[in-house]
Regions:
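An N-terminal assembly and electron-transfer interface module characteristic of large anaerobic redox
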Residues: 2-178
Length: 178
């Protein structure tokens, strides 16, 4: 069921959810980075920007948060993200690429589940199979798509595939954790 966004000249409204590393605001040592927001796509978005544009997705904003900060302020972070989704009328929450960063994948899955339960926005978590515990806990609750670990082969294809799934051009079963 393709959404035909490009044919109608519309764009699918998307918010990106990154940790501080993927947003470009520091390394693992900055896990306490507070919830922040940048207009448009920043950081790792540049890896799949072309795929987004080709598929008719538009990055409204990049939400970023350190996993340690999230764990200490879950309710506040989820509440603010939910309100942003409602305000922007975002249709998709793109949480990733999480690679094999366990704390980021856990944060992404928890936020994705809350957003799925509290809004009409469709969340997608993109992470590597090394996040076994998070995948086992959330794969039947939210859409979790597979990608290689950091430094792994096939990153470009995995991110392009995730975008194709979101835009309706590819079936999610081809990349979803089973």
């Amino acid at each position: 069921m393709p959404p035909f966004y490009i044919e109608r000249g519309e764009q699918m409204r998307t918010l990106l959810l990154f940790d501080q590393v993927q947003a470009g605001f520091g390394g693992k040592e900055r896990g306490d980075t507070e919830l922040g927001l940048e207009k448009g796509g920043v950081g790792s978005y540049l890896m799949f920007k072309e795929d987004f544009e080709t598929a008719g997705l538009t990055a409204l904003a990049t939400i970023y948060c350190g996993p340690d900060y999230f764990q200490a302020h879950k309710e506040e972070v989820i509440h603010k993200i939910k309100n942003l989704i409602l305000k922007t009328k975002a249709e998709v929450l793109f949480a990733g690429p999480c690679f094999n960063y366990g704390t980021y994948a856990q944060m992404a899955a928890e936020i994705a589940l809350a957003i799925q339960e509290q809004t009409d926005c469709k969340p997608y978590v993109i992470c590597s199979k090394e996040n076994e515990e998070t995948i086992a806990a959330y794969k039947d609750k939210v859409v979790m798509l597979e990608m290689p670990k950091k430094g792994g082969v096939g990153l470009r294809e995995a991110l392009g595939g995730a975008v194709a799934i979101i835009s309706g051009k590819k079936d999610e079963s081809e990349q979803r954790f089973q």
